[in-house]
């Protein structure tokens, strides 16, 4: 069936901000889908609130609306654009839920919009737990014994009937939000209350636990004629009980017999035929390891995290094919873009092994509960490809950037066998290293398999790796012969991993490899196991005989990607990498990307001329450089991951385009940077590195409180704190020195001023600032967690001129060629520099979109020697637009048990949304709604607990809230303060006092919003921490910054209404 000619204009709903459970994979699938629809001559209208995406670029869709993803705003877009069709399955759970809501409210029918692809009825059968169970029962597909409940009493009754443990799965939620495994009635009470609250339809599935069964996934495509193909089957190494997003996954499955494989494949096809899927669908099974018994866990009737992985693992562009199916094509009419010979009805075959390992944020959150369960906690993932499981797995380990190049983790040497058992029975992010230590101590393999639920096949593979590691530890370099080294390299061991165990340098192994001619070759991912010639140059390394890479003599540049999504280094850097590649291609330069993230646009097969899916380590990057011999390598767009390679590449005499390793060091080394500032006569807050608590107290006497204290050599504000008095300072310093005595602690005078930020481009002579950004929260809140406003609202002309002057001095002083990011503080009329990053920053996509300056394109051309004055955007500060745009951070702290919520110098947000308006209030209103902050709630009850430093500032805000009609609940001191000002307040007992106390008011739903300004940010033993956590876990708004609160109150008093707001197409 060819293209449906009735489809002229399609609305695509994006997935919104990056949160745990919904990350960059939807930028990748959304971009692919939009391009797939556009190339058929159909107009694409996009709504998505996330400015950090390629998907929201004006080249991807015909009309781009960066607006909140709510029914009200989508309806506005529909009314303005009049699309005839809606493509619902490309925006993750957010897009799906919105499509169902638009349908149920009759908006689609009223506006004459047809849902193309999978129908709303089919989506409901896949998403609504009860409807899904009914379909499974009708087609005789087994499901786990379960009950749908809408209240706690019925839930408890069912659990008592089937026995504990039980699994709680809320309907229409993301990444297992609100779910969990309840081992007792007390745990069930808590999980069920939350699950019912977060489910958009107040419905939860309770099911008997099959914890320990194998978890198997099938990625299936189906067209409107009922043709089906299974694109990929994947096996979770971790058993059922750990969310698939937190599991290590291998493709194709390694331990299924042919009978099991065919049985589950037939079941997958049976299920998607019965539900009537048109497009892609992910089916998850639980398989009893001791029999042929299986049960269907759930399906995702849309593209998903797993479909992004399946796409990258096979080279089959699932999202693009799904979009074509939605337009009316059948699988036998859609050409395979990789081979250009076969069609989408050919099932991919793999002659290699793919491993996905999640990337968790626990380096940022030391106090977090790391135990993995049914609720996803990973922020991102890496993918590795090898010719055998061991090679793919070890590549995966070193891709995680956790400093591990083998399965040895020194801290587990100190653990007793009982402690190790605990770490694998209640598995956390480090369970593989604990398991390896057990095998190192000769713990029986069958016992390890029994207590972990991991198949003996994988345990054997881990055992082989551990045995080789032990042999290396007991050997010297002279024992390493050519055959042994070749065998180790073939199985994925890195030079550094081998060298560490032999106690020599990686350079020694590198030299030996070169003497013996042991170098990697590169194989192609071609979707067809080499059966047809592939046109997509998409490669992985292996130690083999035949090399499939054709090296050209063209002018070429390698772009280093940014690796897995994590807090502090998100999708913004992938955006920058992709735009760099596009700029190079326009200039006729061959582009090569090296990256290892399966979720991103940069690793799509047709973005660059060549893609190497490899770890971003020194050895793996050097192998590619030696193979390709590029004219240069670009590190500026890959975040800290890429920048870290600068020194090594310089030592190897590899030409780095743009800013050099020495210049990077000048910006990042505190002493060199201070010398430069002194020479340029630029101020920074006074400060010093100290080595003891006594030194710290002495230094603070000179500086005066408050001071900002932080460890040296950290990223993303890790471990920073603002202290206001001696007691707080002593507490922080003694803890910090206990953790690390090797490096100094930096103490700076904390200036409570206005924070201002610029991304600038320098060509070595001139500087262009596309836009000066102002932070809403005063300095002290990490720039990634601040609300950012552009154009600035409170910055004088004089200060702007000084910003340009300082930016030019710094860029030329360091010698920047390309991008530079500078953060300033304006305090009492003076301007201070607080940080300089000699690379692209996380604000690049935001400022590119709202200033309309193609920053990455210009920076790339400047790196290649062009001059700013010749590129048409002039120099200096670019002209400001009329519209105001705010970037509002989005947090995933609800997903991470025992993690601090309050804003501070350490970054915690996972994503961002954009709010665009004619006034600041309009822009902020949209930003808050897009970030799901409770801005719309009409009058309610506020629980206020205010730190002594903030009480004076809080009073006028409280009066305003009171005058709007809010009621207050507070503990004794805050309550007294409010009463003195004539504000009615209900006093509650403190946490340590008897019930009913402050936590009970939160648990009993007596509160709508919590305002809590913290005392000691990082101390999880304090009341404030428990208050904030209790509120977040109940889906309540928590505000810890008075600046944010002021902005909200200001908007509330203006009484902005959705219906009066304009929407803006940013593609013009």
UniProtKB/Swiss-Prot annotation:
Region (Allosteric domain): 933-1068
Cofactor section: Mg(2+); Mn(2+)
Organism: Clostridium botulinum (strain Loch Maree / Type A3)
EC number, UniProt record: 6.3.4.16, 6.3.5.5
Binding site for Mg(2+) 3: 823, 835
Binding positions for Mn(2+) 3 per the UniProt entry: 823, 835
Keyword Transport applies: no
SMART domains assigned: CPSase_L_D3 (SM01096), MGS (SM00851)
Residue ranges of domain ATP-grasp in the record: 133-327, 674-864
Binding site for ATP 2: 710, 749, 751, 755, 780-783, 823, 835
Record region (Carboxyphosphate synthetic domain): 1-401
Sequence segments annotated as region (Carbamoyl phosphate synthetic domain): 550-932
Example GO biological process: 'de novo' UMP biosynthetic process
GO molecular-function terms, A-Z: ATP binding; carbamoyl-phosphate synthase (ammonia) activity; carbamoyl-phosphate synthase (glutamine-hydrolyzing) activity; metal ion binding
Limits of the MGS-like domain: 933-1068
Positions of the UniProt region annotated as Oligomerization domain: 402-549
Residues binding Mn(2+) 4: 835, 837
Cofactor note: Binds 4 Mg(2+) or Mn(2+) ions per subunit.
Sites where the protein binds Mg(2+) 4: 835, 837
Residues at which Mn(2+) 1 binds: 284, 298
Record protein name field: Carbamoyl phosphate synthase large chain
Protein encoded by which gene: carB
Domain commentary: The large subunit is composed of 2 ATP-grasp domains that are involved in binding the 2 ATP molecules needed for carbamoyl phosphate synthesis. The N-terminal ATP-grasp domain (referred to as the carboxyphosphate synthetic component) catalyzes the ATP-dependent phosphorylation of hydrogencarbonate to carboxyphosphate and the subsequent nucleophilic attack by ammonia to form a carbamate intermediate.
């Amino acid at each position: 069936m060819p293209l449906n000619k009735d489809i002229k204009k399609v609305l695509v709903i994006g997935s919104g901000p990056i949160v745990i459970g919904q990350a960059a994979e939807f930028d990748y699938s959304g971009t692919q889908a939009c391009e797939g629809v556009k190339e058929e001559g159909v107009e694409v209208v996009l709504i998505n609130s996330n400015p950090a995406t390629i998907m929201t670029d004006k080249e991807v869709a015909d009309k781009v609306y960066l607006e909140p993803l709510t029914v009200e705003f989508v309806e506005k877009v529909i009314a303005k654009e009049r699309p005839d069709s809606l493509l619902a399955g490309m925006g993750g759970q957010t897009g799906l839920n919105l499509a169902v809501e638009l349908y149920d409210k009759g908006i689609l029918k009223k506006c004459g919009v047809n849902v193309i692809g999978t129908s709303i009825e089919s989506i409901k059968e896949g998403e609504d737990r009860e409807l899904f169970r009914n379909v499974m029962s009708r087609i005789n597909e087994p499901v786990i014994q379960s009950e749908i409940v809408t209240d706690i009493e019925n839930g408890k009754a069912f659990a008592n009937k089937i026995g504990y443990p039980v699994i709680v799965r809320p309907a229409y939620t993301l990444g297992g939000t609100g779910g969990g495994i309840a081992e007792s009635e007390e745990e069930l009470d808590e999980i069920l209350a939350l699950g019912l609250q977060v489910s958009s339809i107040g419905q939860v599935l309770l099911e008997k636990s099959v914890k320990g069964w194998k978890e198997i996934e099938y990625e299936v495509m189906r067209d409107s004629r009922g043709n089906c193909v299974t694109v990929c089957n994947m096996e979770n190494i971790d058993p059922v009980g750990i969310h698939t997003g937190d599991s290590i996954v291998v493709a194709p499955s390694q331990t299924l017999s042919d009978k099991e494989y065919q049985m589950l494949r037939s079941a997958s096809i049976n299920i998607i035929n019965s539900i009537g899927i048109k497009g892609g669908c992910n089916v998850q099974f639980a398989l009893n390891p001791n029999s042929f018994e299986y049960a269907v866990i759930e399906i995702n009737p849309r593209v998903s995290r797993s479909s992004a992985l399946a796409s990258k693992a096979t080279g089959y562009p699932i999202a693009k094919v799904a979009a074509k199916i939605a337009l009316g094509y059948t699988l036998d009419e859609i050409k395979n873009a990789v081979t250009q010979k076969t069609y989408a009805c050919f099932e991919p075959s793999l002659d290699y092994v793919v491993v996905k390992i999640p990337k968790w944020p626990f380096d940022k959150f030391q106090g977090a509960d790391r135990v993995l369960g049914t609720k996803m906690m990973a922020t991102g993932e890496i993918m590795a490809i090898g010719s055998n499981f061991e090679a793919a797995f070890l590549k995966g380990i070193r891709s995680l950037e956790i400093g591990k190049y083998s399965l040895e983790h020194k801290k587990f040497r100190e653990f007793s066998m009982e402690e190790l058992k605990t770490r694998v029975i209640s598995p956390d992010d480090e369970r593989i290293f604990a398991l390896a230590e057990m095998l190192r101590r000769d713990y029986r393999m069958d016992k390890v398999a029994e207590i972990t639920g991991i198949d003996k096949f994988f345990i054997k593979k881990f055992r082989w790796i551990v045995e080789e590691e032990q042999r290396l530890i007991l050997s010297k370099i002279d024992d390493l012969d050519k055959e042994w080294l070749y065998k180790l390299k073939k199985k994925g061991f890195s030079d550094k991993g081998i060298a560490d165990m032999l106690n020599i340098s990686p350079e020694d192994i590198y030299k030996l490899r070169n003497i013996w001619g042991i170098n990697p070759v590169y194989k192609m991912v071609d979707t067809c196991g080499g059966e047809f010639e592939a046109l997509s140059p998409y490669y992985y390394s292996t130690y083999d005989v035949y090399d499939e890479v054709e090296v050209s003599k063209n002018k070429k540049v390698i772009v280093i990607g940014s690796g897995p999504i994590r807090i502090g280094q998100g999708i913004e850097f992938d955006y920058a990498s992709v735009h760099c590649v596009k700029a190079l291609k326009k200039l006729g330069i061959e582009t090569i990307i090296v990256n290892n993230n399966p979720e991103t646009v940069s690793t799509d097969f047709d973005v660059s001329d060549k893609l190497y899916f490899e770890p971003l380590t020194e050895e793996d990057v050097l192998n590619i450089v030696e193979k390709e011999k590029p004219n240069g390598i670009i590190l500026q767009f890959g975040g800290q991951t890429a920048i870290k390679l600068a020194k090594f590449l310089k030592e190897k005499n590899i030409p780095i385009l743009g800013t050099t390793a020495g210049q990077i060091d000048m910006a990042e080394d505190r002493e060199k940077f201070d010398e430069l500032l002194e020479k340029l006569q630029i101020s920074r807050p006074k400060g010093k590195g100290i080595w003891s608590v006594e030194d710290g107290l002495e230094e603070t006497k000179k500086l005066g409180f408050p001071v900002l204290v932080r460890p040296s050599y950290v990223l993303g504000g890790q471990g920073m704190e603002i202290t206001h008095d001696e007691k707080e300072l002593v507490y922080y310093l003694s803890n910090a020195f206990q953790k690390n005595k090797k490096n100094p602690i930096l103490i700076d005078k904390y200036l409570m001023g206005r924070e201002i930020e610029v991304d600038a481009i320098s060509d070595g002579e001139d500087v262009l600032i596309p836009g000066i950004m102002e932070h809403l929260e005063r300095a002290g809140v990490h720039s990634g967690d601040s609300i950012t406003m552009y154009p600035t609202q409170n910055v004088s002309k004089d200060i702007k001129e000084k910003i340009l002057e300082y930016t030019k001095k710094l860029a030329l002083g360091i010698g920047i060629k390309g991008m530079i990011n500078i953060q300033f503080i304006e305090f009492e009329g003076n301007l201070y520099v607080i940080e300089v990053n000699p690379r692209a920053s996380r604000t690049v996509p935001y400022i590119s979109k709202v200033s309309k300056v193609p920053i990455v394109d210009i920076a790339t051309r400047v790196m290649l020697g062009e001059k700013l004055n010749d590129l048409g955007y002039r120099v200096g500060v670019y002209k400001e637009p009329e519209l105001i745009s705010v970037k509002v951070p989005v947090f995933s702290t609800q997903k991470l048990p025992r993690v601090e919520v309050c804003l501070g110098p350490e970054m915690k947000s996972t994503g961002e949304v954009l709010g665009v308006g004619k006034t600041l209030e309009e822009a902020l209103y949209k930003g808050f709604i897009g970030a799901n902050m409770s801005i719309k709630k009409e009058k309610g009850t506020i629980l206020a607990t205010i730190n002594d430093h903030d009480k004076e500032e809080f009073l006028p805000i409280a009066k305003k809230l009171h005058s709007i009609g809010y009621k207050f609940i507070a503990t004794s001191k805050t309550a007294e303060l409010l009463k003195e000002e004539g504000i009615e307040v209900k006093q509650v007992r403190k946490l340590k006092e008897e019930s009913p106390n402050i936590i009970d008011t939160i648990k009993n739903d007596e509160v709508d919003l919590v305002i809590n300004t913290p005392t000691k940010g990082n101390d999880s033993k304090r009341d404030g921490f428990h208050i904030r956590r209790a509120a977040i876990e109940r889906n309540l708004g928590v505000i810890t910054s008075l600046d944010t609160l002021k902005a909200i109150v200001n908007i509330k008093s203006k009484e902005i209404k959705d219906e009066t707001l304009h929407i803006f197409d940013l593609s013009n």
